[in-house]
């Protein structure tokens, strides 16, 4: 029953009793009835307000400012996915600065990484399992001045698959830092030429991957992290 209906019923009851009541006793009865009616209406109004503004009644479940509980399914799914990805093959090798005149990959320097079955053999990364892999590599060339003959710098990533044992280039780039010869009377200014390559490939267990260049004498080893090669299982 709504509050308006309750008030209407009380008013009708007052009118009926007022007509029937007479004399002093009737006046006192009307006064008591009016007081009771007022209290009833006030109580009903208060109850309606409390229910309307949610002070009483069913309580809503509140979320903490930090978000959902740590036991919620999305967090569990994310944790499971993270644990699964940590078991995937990954490798990151860097250039051996103690091998001038050639590009030799090394897995024992700081920031190098070999995990979950990947091996470095004969300067090649050996894939431990079938799947999709991100393959990436960067080299940095540098020198001063430009020769009279054209200078072309190449960077190639190749694959030797277990299924056909033929070396195939899967990523390749070529750059020319010099557009004209530096005159004899001019100052030979330094130049830098980075080449970065990366792509996703379907590989098989036992595939061998190599990253090579054509002119290792131009490699820049001045800073760590400039020449690297790696794979990440997806």
From Swiss-Prot:
**Which stretches does the entry tag as region Disordered?**
62-87
Phosphoserine PTM sites in chain numbering: 2
| Annotated S-S bridges | 146-178
Transmembrane intervals: 34-56
Q: State whether keyword Transmembrane applies.
A: yes
Q: Where is the lipid attached (N6-myristoyl lysine)?
A: 20
UniProt membrane topology term: Single-pass type II membrane protein
Please list the GO terms describing molecular function: cytokine activity; tumor necrosis factor receptor binding
- Keyword tags: Cell membrane, Cytokine, Disulfide bond, Glycoprotein, Lipoprotein, Membrane, Myristate, Phosphoprotein, Secreted, Signal-anchor, Transmembrane, Transmembrane helix
Extracellular compartment spans: 57-234
- Check the record and name the InterPro entries matching this protein: TNF (IPR006053), TNF_alpha (IPR002959), TNF_CS (IPR021184), TNF_dom (IPR006052), Tumour_necrosis_fac-like_dom (IPR008983)
The main location class comes to: membrane
The record places the following residue ranges in the Cytoplasmic compartment, namely 1-33
UniProt lists compositionally biased (Polar residues) regions at 69-87
> Where does this one sit in the cell?
Cell membrane
- Please give a single GO biological process term from the UniProt record: positive regulation of transcription by RNA polymerase II
Modification after translation, per record:
The soluble form derives from the membrane form by proteolytic processing. The membrane-bound form is further proteolytically processed by SPPL2A or SPPL2B through regulated intramembrane proteolysis producing TNF intracellular domains (ICD1 and ICD2) released in the cytosol and TNF C-domain 1 and C-domain 2 secreted into the extracellular space. The membrane form, but not the soluble form, is phosphorylated on serine residues. Dephosphorylation of the membrane form occurs by binding to soluble TNFRSF1A/TNFR1.
Q: Subunit details for this protein?
A: Homotrimer. Interacts with SPPL2B.
The family line of this record is: Belongs to the tumor necrosis factor family.
Name-wise, this protein is Tumor necrosis factor
Native species of this protein?
Boselaphus tragocamelus (Nilgai)
